Amino acid sequence: MKNDKVTPKKEKPKENLTVEQKVRREIIAWFWVGLVFLLINGAIGQARVIPSGSMENTLLIGDHLIMSRVGYDAGIPFTNMHVPLWRNPRRQQIIIFKPPFDPTQPDYVKRAIGLPGDTVDIHDNAVWINGQKLIENYTLGKTERIENSDVKMPYKVPDNCYFAMGDNRQNSYDSRFWGCVPRNDIIGTPIVIYMSLNASPEAWQPGQIGERFLAYLNGIIHPGTVRWRRLFHVF
């Protein structure tokens, strides 16, 4: 007869770790998680929050975005340095960039309207590119020139530059005021809205840590302040 007995597998001896060893293991594990997050956050993508209404109604105050840097810019972790890459914005694509007139300010979010070499003009409540009217179904308010601006129309976009405008045309500080955005200042484009809170605009201004904390706390206590329909909108 065949031997039907099954030889039991030997169990691996359990690790008898001290509390100190367990704590050390957890710290090391979370260290690597944090390091990977920082590398991804700096080099591949970043989170952004919309502090103003210049892109309404495409983007609302309190919209929280994930920005992709892939192909546009490589951030160097733990530094403020960045390296422009190979990808260039398409016409009418939303872009995120360092303000060329003051790179120390928070990043701007606008729409790329004029590409390098384009001639941009504004009249009859519309943007004209190289003599052709640009079809725009996302704007809010009248599209007008800025009187007494140093940017004169028609405007020839220089090489390696982009003419950027906010969708909220009467409430946007954009290329009509200060000229083009150099390609090297463009760091990415939004890919998804992961959170949107209807809170005081002051909460989303730089340095308003207390106000921002209260906005998040209020969102937890009062879920009605979350704009649920905007969540996970993909660009």
Describe the role of every protein-language-model region:
Residues 2-26, 43-49, 54-235:
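Soluble "head" domains of membrane/secretory-pathway proteins
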Residues 28-43:
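Hydrophobic membrane-insertion alpha-helices, especially the h-region
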